[in-house]
């Protein structure tokens, strides 16, 4: 190649003089920076100390949210890159808005007070939930509108499951283990409530908040059982006792 390009005399070529150097030889200061002067900056994280820490944290967070959106959409294995890109952007924008609202409206913006149902002081989580629940509904509506534009109902459910780490299936499985011979009607009601919880929960930033939303709908499920001939407290007690007996039996083996 070089002989052709530079018009070299091929008779003078001597391949014995050709050496192949490892890539690491190109690193002037060693492969891992071993030859760098003492005190030299070795990572971008150290450079960040000289910049706006809040802005740097947001940049890192943005990158993390973007990766999350990309990974979630990639799991759908869409054949249309344009639709996939649109879905990624919709999810990324929603995740950012949820994060920004949460960070800009801390629990301290909610006055201390009592829970009117229990009479107990509002917890930090209670106040976080109140603050975050005030996020404009348009944020949620925009996400769902955009997802419906490019995804099927089944694909949207898969994305919502990503937001809530599969809590619908996990919680339903728990009810099926606790409630003896759970009927089709009961299963339909429980699944309906859990899906409502899932869609509401995507507008909250962390797992404690997501779990708190699911607790609201789990309470409705348990009230449903009590109102339709079941005794939730007794069923749960029986389930716990059964599990304890099973563990004892396994321990004796």
What residue spans do the PLM features occupy?
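Alpha/beta-hydrolase-fold serine-hydrolase catalytic core, especially in secreted/extracellular enzymes
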Residues: 1-57
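Charge-rich (acidic/polar
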Residues: 53-253
């Amino acid at each position: 190649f070089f002989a052709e390009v530079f018009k070299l005399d091929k008779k003078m070529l001597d391949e014995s003089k050709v050496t192949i150097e490892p890539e690491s030889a190109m690193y002037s200061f060693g492969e891992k920076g071993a030859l760098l002067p003492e005190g030299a900056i070795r990572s971008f994280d150290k450079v960040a100390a000289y910049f706006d820490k809040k802005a740097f944290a947001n940049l890192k967070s943005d990158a993390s949210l973007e990766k999350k959106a990309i990974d979630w959409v990639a799991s759908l294995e869409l054949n249309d890159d344009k639709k996939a890109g649109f879905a990624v952007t919709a999810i990324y924008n929603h995740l950012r808005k949820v994060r920004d609202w949460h960070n800009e409206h801390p629990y301290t913006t909610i006055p201390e007070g009592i829970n009117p149902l229990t009479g107990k002081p509002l917890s930090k989580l209670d106040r976080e939930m109140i603050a975050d629940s005030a996020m404009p509904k348009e944020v949620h509506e925009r996400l769902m509108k955009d997802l419906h534009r490019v995804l099927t109902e089944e694909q949207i459910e898969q994305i919502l499951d990503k937001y809530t780490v599969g809590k619908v299936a996990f919680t339903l499985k728990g009810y099926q283990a606790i409630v003896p011979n759970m009927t089709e009607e009961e299963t339909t009601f429980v699944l309906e409530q859990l899906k409502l919880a899932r869609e509401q929960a995507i507008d909250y930033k962390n797992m404690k908040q997501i779990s708190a939303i699911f607790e609201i709908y789990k309470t409705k499920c348990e009230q449903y059982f009590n109102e339709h001939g079941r005794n939730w407290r007794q069923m749960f007690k029986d389930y716990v006792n059964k599990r304890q007996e099973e563990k004892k039996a396994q321990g004796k083996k």
